[in-house]
Amino acid sequence: EPIVITKIELYPYEEEPTYEEFLAQKLSEGIKVIDKLGDGVIKIQAECPTLVSNACLYPINDRTSSLTEPQDPQKIKFNIVNSTTVNQWMQYKVTVPEDGLYTIAIRFRQNDLIGMFTSRRILINNELQFQEASTIRFKYNSGWQSAVANDGAQNFTFYLKKGENTVTFETVLGDMTDYVYRVEQLIDSLNAAYKQMLQLTGPTPDSYRDYGFNRLVPDAVQTIRDAAVELYEIADELEEITGELGDQVATLNTIAILFETMGDDEYEIAPNFVTFKNYIIALSNWLYAALNQPLKVDYFTVQGTEDPLPKAKSNFFESIGFEIRAFIGSFYMDYTTVDFKTDEVYSEENTVEMWITSALGRDDALITRNLVDTYFTPESGITVKMKVITTGLTEAILAGIGPDIASMSSVDTIT
């Protein structure tokens, strides 16, 4: 692709201070640590960012907890945001009453990477205040959690000036960067070893034949042996970091056991050659999973160090009350209508009706609903009533009671 460069400037590299250095510097400047905001705790809904790096970062609905905000037992409300891809970011505006060092507490859910953690980088006013802010961890748990921004060892405070500030959450690999690089190097070397052995054995080796691997391809055998040692080290380090043996760590241990067996005994290579290839593929899948950093966020708060954390999980009575209201509402809710935003400036004359066939799915209807509310209605002043239907579109049109707009799948034909 063509590119035009007008100017190149070189700057000296300046490393960010550690958190201890950052904290000592701010305290020496007379900036105080905010202990309590009390009722003045600032809450920012994650589904309402000021800026996003990519259009695929959009709010979604979550009904797994009655505490998720905003929540409704019958209606679908966009109340969380889910980001997974590295280098994507979301920025929010935060206004604080005074200069100081504040904590940032997040209500989140990380239930995708079992036994692992995902990472985020937090920028304040587009600046990384200290090194550890690039490795904010969110550990695995099947339910919702609340935690102050931390690196797994200590909680952090961030400097915010009086008035408006920006807080940016960027998806990063964090402490997983080194492990991703090491596994990537292993996959390359193991693929090379596999190709060397494949030249001797063919795709389906004879399990009872002596191929002389140690004599003909000693480097390939040594590569497998070294890979086993490296995988054991990575698994042990990850288990030490996370404090538990999750699926990702167990996968590495399982692969390492086979590699160790093949590396120590060349007669085990041919019988396990097909499995060896599949385990290289499994390592690639592990790498792909590690490159994704899924995290669902409900909201975050800017608060004092002594302010209580946001409530993460609802109690029994809150949960059962929410489910009862949802059950009762199911008897009178109109599930065919994808509701529209009401606004007094829009009249009935400026309203059109749109029917969507169920073959396209409710997800498509929600996407269309979001596009209409975000772009079409504000620009045109026309609201759209949307309904998801199963059958009867042709009959309704022939009877003269059809919609203004119909969105059909390829199997629906009207002549």
Q: Over which residues does each language-model region extend?
A:
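Short, well-ordered beta-strand elements
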Residues: 347-361, 376, 382-387, 405
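Solvent-exposed, polar/charged alpha-helical surfaces in well-ordered, non-transmembrane soluble domains
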Residues: 366, 370-378, 395
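Extracytoplasmic/periplasmic, Sec-exported soluble proteins
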Residues: 114, 360, 364, 368, ...
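Extracytoplasmic ectodomains of secretory-pathway proteins
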Residues: 275-347
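N-terminal targeting or signal-anchor segments and their processing/structural boundaries
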Residues: 25-29, 346-349, 355-356, 364-367
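Extracellular/periplasmic catalytic domains that process cell-envelope and extracellular macromolecules
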Residues: 160, 345-349, 398-400
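Extracytoplasmic
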Residues: 1-302
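Ligand-binding clamshell of periplasmic/extracellular solute-binding protein-like
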Residues: 358, 386-415
